[in-house]
Amino acid sequence: MNFVLSLIFLALILKGVQCEVHLVESGGGLVKPGGSLKLSCVVSGFTFNKYAMSWVRQTPEKRLEWVATISSGGLYTYYPDSVKGRFTISRDNAGNTLYLQMSSLRSEDTAMYYCAR
């Protein structure tokens, strides 16, 4: 969690046309156990409100873990038991932004967090 900002550039080939998708995460930092943190991910390069979005994390041991998913309209959210009741995923479709509010943080939540389509 000590990595403050990560930037992901993905190149997609859609129907023979190259398209650049940008996902820019921010809000990371060092937090003591029991603390809270809110991450955000600003998206461009695709129609944000047409896709479900997720947060995933990579642990210090390089293990990938699914953290949360939200439906395209924001009505439905899904979490693994490990974060249920502590993490809240949300989205602002007008602002093309995905959020992850994390509370009651534990040492096992230490990871690099990424938004994903």
Swiss-Prot record:
<dbReference type="GO" id="GO:0016064">
    <property type="term" value="P:immunoglobulin mediated immune response"/>
</dbReference>
<dbReference type="InterPro" id="IPR013106">
    <property type="entry name" value="Ig_V-set"/>
</dbReference>
<keyword id="KW-0391">Immunity</keyword>
<dbReference type="GO" id="GO:0005576">
    <property type="term" value="C:extracellular region"/>
</dbReference>
<dbReference type="InterPro" id="IPR050199">
    <property type="entry name" value="IgHV"/>
</dbReference>
<feature type="region of interest" description="Framework-1">
    <location>
        <begin position="20"/>
        <end position="49"/>
    </location>
</feature>
<dbReference type="Pfam" id="PF07686">
    <property type="entry name" value="V-set"/>
</dbReference>
<feature type="signal peptide">
    <location>
        <begin position="1"/>
        <end position="19"/>
    </location>
</feature>
<protein>
    <recommendedName>
        <fullName>Ig heavy chain V region 5-76</fullName>
    </recommendedName>
</protein>
<feature type="region of interest" description="Framework-3">
    <location>
        <begin position="86"/>
        <end position="117"/>
    </location>
</feature>
<feature type="disulfide bond">
    <location>
        <begin position="41"/>
        <end position="115"/>
    </location>
</feature>
<feature type="region of interest" description="Complementarity-determining-1">
    <location>
        <begin position="50"/>
        <end position="54"/>
    </location>
</feature>
<keyword id="KW-1280">Immunoglobulin</keyword>
<feature type="region of interest" description="Complementarity-determining-2">
    <location>
        <begin position="69"/>
        <end position="85"/>
    </location>
</feature>
<dbReference type="GO" id="GO:0003823">
    <property type="term" value="F:antigen binding"/>
</dbReference>
<feature type="region of interest" description="Framework-2">
    <location>
        <begin position="55"/>
        <end position="68"/>
    </location>
</feature>
<keyword id="KW-1015">Disulfide bond</keyword>
<keyword id="KW-0732">Signal</keyword>
<dbReference type="InterPro" id="IPR013783">
    <property type="entry name" value="Ig-like_fold"/>
</dbReference>
<dbReference type="InterPro" id="IPR036179">
    <property type="entry name" value="Ig-like_dom_sf"/>
</dbReference>
<keyword id="KW-1064">Adaptive immunity</keyword>
<dbReference type="InterPro" id="IPR007110">
    <property type="entry name" value="Ig-like_dom"/>
</dbReference>
<dbReference type="GO" id="GO:0019814">
    <property type="term" value="C:immunoglobulin complex"/>
</dbReference>
